[in-house]
Curated annotation (Swiss-Prot):
Catalytic activity, reaction form: a (3R)-hydroxyacyl-[ACP] + UDP-N-acetyl-alpha-D-glucosamine = a UDP-3-O-[(3R)-3-hydroxyacyl]-N-acetyl-alpha-D-glucosamine + holo-[ACP]
Gene3D superfamilies for the chain: Hexapeptide repeat proteins (2.160.10.10), Udp N-acetylglucosamine O-acyltransferase, C-terminal domain (1.20.1180.10)
Chief site of localization: cytoplasm
Protein name per its UniProtKB record: Acyl-[acyl-carrier-protein]--UDP-N-acetylglucosamine O-acyltransferase
Highest taxon above the source species: Bacteria
Enzyme class: transferase
Organism: Rickettsia typhi (strain ATCC VR-144 / Wilmington)
Signal peptide range: none
UniProt-listed Enzyme Commission number(s): 2.3.1.129
Protein task: Involved in the biosynthesis of lipid A, a phosphorylated glycolipid that anchors the lipopolysaccharide to the outer membrane of the cell.
Family: Belongs to the transferase hexapeptide repeat family. LpxA subfamily.
Gene behind this protein: lpxA
InterPro entries: Acetyltransf_C, Acetyltransf_C_sf, Hexapep, Lipid_A_LpxA, Trimer_LpxA-like_sf
Keyword Lipid metabolism: yes
């Protein structure tokens, strides 16, 4: 680590570990159990504390706060951690808080994500790869977000909710139920509006397969009879469609939340 990459006003606790070419800007504060891997850049006024690891090539902008204790009354100073992967862009005022005893003690963020201004990632969240969270997205604790999902600005997600891969949540949406993979949800109380067909096309999914999957989803959520029976019927009917299979797998997993449904 070259001292020329560390601004003279930065406060770095003894014990912090830096990789190669780490850059720390003015007035940053780094705790004693923080690990910054190669080419991490902290612009200025960034606070990183706790047992926290930041992956290589991640850039963090002013006034972000990473690794602070979770916002829960039952937190008892347990030594929980925050792990953030590589190639992330973390913009101004983003907060990512450490895990808790009730959630495995780790808040984990993957790689290649863009978190815009004011995003909050609560304790024990498990965040995937290649995501976009627009301005002021707020995630409560214990939320799981699959790869390539997009969450629109000022949306809030209820604790323990699952957001499936390639899904999209429109801006200003409160989400209190699980969002299926590829799902498109929005509204004052987030409802399923179909599949994220535009996003799927951009990611190279076959158009026919995507439209077939939309038909399958409509059969599951809008069909007659028992919901569980419809899942089984659709799983068999569309067993050769990998998109449908991914959605069915998601629906069959254990969850403490219900699912976002079409508006009745």
């Amino acid at each position: 680590m070259s001292n020329s990459n560390i601004h003279t006003t930065a406060i770095i606790a003894e014990g912090a570990k830096f990789g190669k070419n780490v850059k720390v800007g003015p007035y940053c504060i780094i705790g004693p159990e923080v690990v910054l891997h190669d080419n991490v850049e902290l612009k200025s006024h960034v606070v990183i504390d706790g047992i926290t690891e930041i992956g290589e090539n991640t850039v963090i902008y002013p006034f972000a706060s990473i690794g602070q204790p979770p916002q829960i009354l039952k937190y008892a100073n347990e030594r929980s951690s925050t792990i953030i992967g590589s190639n992330n862009t973390i913009r101004e005022y983003v907060t990512v808080q450490a895990g808790s005893k009730s959630g495995g003690m780790i808040t984990r963020v993957g790689n290649n994500n863009l978190f815009m201004v004011g995003v909050h990632i609560g304790h024990d969240c498990k965040i995937g790869n290649n995501l976009v969270f627009a301005n002021y997205v707020s995630l409560a604790g214990h939320i799981k977000v699959g790869d390539y999902a997009i969450i629109g600005g000022l949306s809030a997600v209820h604790q323990y909710t699952r957001i499936g891969e390639y899904s999209m949540i429109g801006g200003l949406s409160p989400v209190s139920a699980d969002v299926i993979p590829f799902g498109l949800v929005s509204s004052k109380r987030a409802v399923l509006e179909g599949l994220n067909l535009i996003g799927m096309n951009r990611k190279g999914f076959d158009k026919v397969d995507s439209l077939t999957a939309l038909n399958a989803v409509e059969e599951i959520f809008l069909g007659k009879g028992n919901f569980a029976d419809r899942i089984k019927q659709v799983a068999e009917k569309y067993k050769n469609n990998s998109i449908v299979t991914q959605i069915i797998d998601f629906l069959n997993q254990d969850s403490s939340r219900s699912f976002c449904h079409f508006k009745k």
